[in-house]
Amino acid sequence: MELIFLGTSAGVPTRSRNVTAILLHLQHPTQPGVWLFDCGEGTQHQMLNTAFHPGKLERIFISHLHGDHLFGLPGLLCSRSMAGNPHPLTVYGPQGVREFIATTLRLSGSWTDFPLQIEEVSAGDILDDGLRKVTAFRLEHPLECYGYRVVEHDKPGALNARALKAAGVTPGPLFQALKAGKTVTLADGRQINGADYLAPAVAGKSVAIFGDTAPCEAALALAQGVDVMVHETTLDASMEEKANSRGHSSTRQTATLAREAAVGRLIMTHISSRYDDKGCQRLLAECRAIFPATELAYDFSVFPV
């Protein structure tokens, strides 16, 4: 998996940062895909600067209904429809996202020509496509808001072909069954258990993508042990009280969460427009002082998971 940041500003766009949107590129060898997390104003325009377009999207996850996370959605849906893309799309989000989509399309005389499914979520598992699971966590914000934890299923370990050949098993259909951990019977009557010839399973990658939030109990469960945590750092440590009063987090709080959750890496985003490049570097330094494995996202930054 890899993350492509389309917008990294909080509240309003700036000359260098658009409002929130993040692509998750699912780099599976046989079932690749592209998911979008939040869709602030101008998201479809930002996508023009990437290798992806709205037609490639399979799923969109909306954290909450504030405009800087949502107002780009109607235009993106309409453009996807105008392009003649027939592939289905599912939108996940809090209560009200269905009404928002229906109302904006109706009042603007617009529609979608592709199958559009809308799922209003609550805390808990919301998706398992056989390759990965998505769990929603309710966060602390003035509007109903969720963060999403995406965890790949573990991959089977490599098959020890050399040992199987030494045991008299020839490559072919039997190898496929053994790779699946099944027991096969050879022509001479011997039974071979595939599990005995498999290396340990390879742990799937995991990422936690937060919506806007002040510190809360659910945040630790959402982030616990993930390879990558994407979290807002709206304001610096000196403005912590103001951040919390508006349902946001400071640099200090975000970095402390990353440390307590033992994540592999923290990626900062949702930066207040009050900070210029120098100010952003100060935010980064505040986080790294607590959690060194921190990166600052810019628009079009790409990070592997």
Swiss-Prot record:
Which InterPro entries does this entry report, sorted A to Z? Metallo-B-lactamas, RibonucZ/Hydroxyglut_hydro, Rnase_BN, RNase_Z/BN
Mind giving the lineage of the organism this protein is from? Answer: Bacteria, Pseudomonadati, Pseudomonadota, Gammaproteobacteria, Enterobacterales
Residues binding Zn(2+) 1, per UniProt = 64, 66, 141, 212
Q: What is this protein called?
A: Ribonuclease BN
Free-text cofactor note: Binds 2 Zn(2+) ions.
UniProt: Zn(2+) 2 binding residues? 68-69, 212, 270
Q: Which family does it belong to?
A: Belongs to the RNase Z family. RNase BN subfamily.
Identify the keywords attached in UniProt to this record, alphabetized: Endonuclease, Exonuclease, Hydrolase, Metal-binding, Nuclease, tRNA processing, Zinc
Q: PANTHER family from the xrefs?
A: ZINC PHOSPHODIESTERASE ELAC PROTEIN 1
Quaternary structure and interacting proteins, as annotated: Homodimer.
- Give the Enzyme Commission number: 3.1.-.-
Give a short account of what the protein does: Zinc phosphodiesterase, which has both exoribonuclease and endoribonuclease activities.
Q: Which GO terms describe its molecular function?
A: 3'-tRNA processing endoribonuclease activity; exonuclease activity; zinc ion binding
- Catalytic center residues: 68
Q: Which organism is it from?
A: Salmonella gallinarum (strain 287/91 / NCTC 13346)
Q: Which domain of life is it from?
A: Bacteria
Q: Is Zinc given among the entry's keywords?
A: yes
**Which Pfam families does the UniProt record give?**
Lactamase_B_2
